[in-house]
Regions:
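Cytosol/matrix-facing amphipathic helices and coiled-coil assembly/linker segments
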Residues: 1-23, 75-157
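Juxtamembrane boundary at the C-terminal end of a transmembrane helix
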Residues: 225-237
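Residue-level signature of catalytic and energy-coupling elements of molecular machines
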Residues: 30, 69, 118-122, 160, ...
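Alpha-helical transmembrane segments in multi-pass membrane proteins
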Residues: 54, 58, 62, 66, ...
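The feature identifies polytopic integral membrane transport proteins across all domains of life
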Residues: 16-27, 49-57, 117, 149-154, ...
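C-terminal ends of transmembrane helices
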Residues: 72-76, 142, 195-205
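Internal alpha-helical transmembrane segments
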Residues: 1-74
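Structural signal for alpha-helical transmembrane segments and their flanking helix-loop junctions
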Residues: 27, 31-38, 133-177
Length: 237
């Protein structure tokens, strides 16, 4: 019988990849849904292109800044917390080396290793890189892979702008009679693509994320279109 396990891809650094993927997909989806819903709602309230363009541009600027700021604050808080934990772990290793070695051995013993094997693993890992060994086993932290908050902020802003560009172009370049429908369809197709790409890169089933994100986007667009149409009709009375 052929063993195909050797063909299965494995990645040691998969967690950072998922973090960047999450931020990128979230930013793009937020840009698509936010700006599409905004311009569709305004277009439902008025046929004048001026307010639609102004609202779209304002939404893009506000949304990209909000995404960047939110990601910067979130990642900075996480990094500060991880840095504090790393500092404390270094101090404990300096003050209580024997106790920390016993703790590391106990961790691997709880994972199923025999006491003698766990002690040997702990000693070898400690000899290789004592700080990295304890950070990984006790806290799940890799000191070399702490996320840069500035990188995260720029990534979120750029991904939001990339997602927001599609509905903005769709609503401004399409004839008046078709712009709402075309923006609606183009946005849902874009959401399906981002959902599918995210699932593929994350090595998860594709159908469920695609259905989930397109259903949510359709609901958001339908609600804002309805509210815009209602407000537009009331204003014209």
């Amino acid at each position: 019988m052929k063993d195909d396990h050797g063909l299965e891809p494995h990645s040691v650094n998969f967690a950072p990849r998922l973090n960047w993927l999450r931020a990128g997909i979230l930013g793009a989806n937020d840009g698509i849904v936010s700006i599409a819903a905004l311009v569709v709602g305004v277009a439902a309230a008025t046929s004048d292109s001026g307010p639609i363009v102004v609202a779209g541009i304002a939404g893009i600027i506000a949304g990209s800044l909000s995404m960047a700021l939110g990601e910067y604050v979130s990642v900075s808080s996480q990094r500060d917390s991880e840095t504090s934990l790393i500092k404390r772990e270094r101090q404990e290793l300096q003050d209580f080396p024997a106790e920390e070695l016993a703790e590391l051995a106990e961790i691997y013993e709880h994972k199923g290793l025999s006491p003698s094997t766990a002690a040997l693993v702990a000693k070898e890992l400690t000899a290789h890189d004592v700080v990295a060994a304890h950070l990984d086993a006790e806290l799940g932290i890799n000191e070399r892979q702490l996320t840069n908050p500035w990188h995260a902020a720029v990534s979120s802003a750029v991904s939001f702008l990339a997602g927001a560009a599609l509905p903005m172009l769709a609503i401004t370049l399409t004839p008046d009679n078709w712009r709402i429908l075309f923006t609606f369809v183009a946005s849902l197709v874009a959401l399906a693509l981002t959902g599918g790409i995210g699932a593929y890169l994350g090595q998860s089933p594709i159908l469920r994320p695609v259905l989930r994100v397109t259903a949510g986007g359709a609901l958001a667009l339908a609600l804002t279109w309805g509210i815009g149409a209602l407000l537009g009709s009331n204003t014209s009375l």
